[in-house]
Curated annotation (Swiss-Prot):
One of its GO terms (molecular function) is NAD binding. SUPFAM superfamilies: NAD kinase/diacylglycerol kinase-like (SSF111331). This is NAD kinase. Its main location: cytoplasm. It catalyses: NAD(+) + ATP = ADP + NADP(+) + H(+). It comes from Magnetococcus marinus (strain ATCC BAA-1437 / JCM 17883 / MC-1). Its EC number is 2.7.1.23. NAD(+) binds at D71, G72, N145, D146, R156, R173, D175, T186, G187, Y188, S189, L190, S191, Q245. Keywords: ATP-binding, Cytoplasm, Kinase, NAD, NADP, Nucleotide-binding, Transferase. It is found in: Cytoplasm. Disulfide bonds: none annotated. The gene is nadK. It holds the Pfam family NAD_kinase.
Length: 303
């Protein structure tokens, strides 16, 4: 792995500082580094140390993309690097994430292992969401975590009809509807009472948000199923949110169609780390009360 792209959470001073230090370290390892113009400016990175590319092209020609930030930064970067099929490594800046599972303190040792070939690559399922209107298709969007239909500013219920592979499954009144990947099962869907799905399983979750009828429970369907739903009531201020980062207004008559994408995200993991360790730490299973985390960065001399 000789060409490394960096994606930085620009609102996080720790991530900016880490980007600067990592760029210098990678140069000492004789790796070619690429950063965004915004990150180069924020971290004061010399053009001699890194090439500059727009975020949407950061994966082009790279052997690895490293995301410095949180899960939200990782999800945004995932869509940008998807077309390049480049593996991604997530580094968290203080809080363990389900996607950014490597801590800053572990980063350098972890990268040495990666450069030595000691790593696993896991393909994460993605979804493709479509909105179909009488005027034609108005949206096609790749999603790593979830697609959520919900009300906008007012806390009111929605009514929708859900079908799978053209077969009607249920009609529900609820605060909204979540369609999630296994990766997204630990996101909004988990907060809405959905199950945790191992990321290697080929399945899609359909999860009503606070349904009016308690018998409307989350269901998991095969990954090759096509899920579609329509809103059955004429009400304003309805949105379709994609990975919690893009919102699209919904109109009367819209049909939302969701299916497994023909693309997947390649995520790098240490073979010494397992998914259940991350669940236990992130969800505080059997954690000792009062445990504190050291969020400080190590001095460069300690690496």
């Amino acid at each position: 792995m000789n060409s490394i792209g960096l994606v930085t959470k620009l609102s996080d001073p720790m991530a900016i500082r880490a980007t600067s230090e990592l760029t210098e370290w990678l140069n000492k390892q004789h790796r070619r580094v690429t950063v965004t113009a915004e990150a180069a400016k924020a971290a004061n990175i010399s053009p001699k140390l890194a090439a500059i590319k727009p975020l949407e092209d950061i994966g082009e020609g790279q052997d690895l993309v490293i995301v410095l930030g949180g899960d939200g930064t990782f999800i945004g970067a995932a869509r940008d690097v998807l077309r390049w099929k480049v593996p991604v490594l997530g580094v968290n800046m203080g809080r363990l994430g389900f996607l950014t599972e490597v801590s800053y303190d572990e980063m350098y040792d972890n990268l040495k292992e990666v450069f030595a070939g000691h790593y696993n690559v896991e393909d994460r399922m993605m979804l493709t969401a479509f909105i179909r209107r009488e005027s034609g298709e108005v949206l096609s969007h790749h999603v790593l975590n979830d697609v959520v239909a919900h009300k906008g500013h007012l806390a009111r219920m929605m009514e929708f009809q859900v079908s799978i592979n053209g077969q009607h499954v249920f009609t529900s009144r609820a605060d909204g509807l979540i369609v999630a990947t296994p990766t997204g099962s630990t996101g909004y869907s988990l907060s809405a009472g959905g199950p945790i799905i191992h990321p290697r399983l080929d399945t899609i979750i359909i999860n009503p948000i606070c349904p009016h009828t308690l018998s409307n429970r989350p269901i998991a369907v095969p990954g090759d199923g096509q899920i579609s739903f329509r809103l059955t009531q004429n009400e304003p201020d309805r949105l379709l949110t994609l990975d919690g980062q893009t919102g699209v207004p919904l109109l009367d008559g819209d049909e939302i169609v969701i299916r497994k994408s023909d693309r997947s995200l390649r995520v790098i993991h240490s073979p010494d780390r397992n998914y259940y360790d991350i669940l236990r730490k992130k969800l505080h299973w059997a954690e000792t009360v009062g445990t504190k985390r050291d969020l400080s960065l190590r001095p460069a001399d300690d690496r």
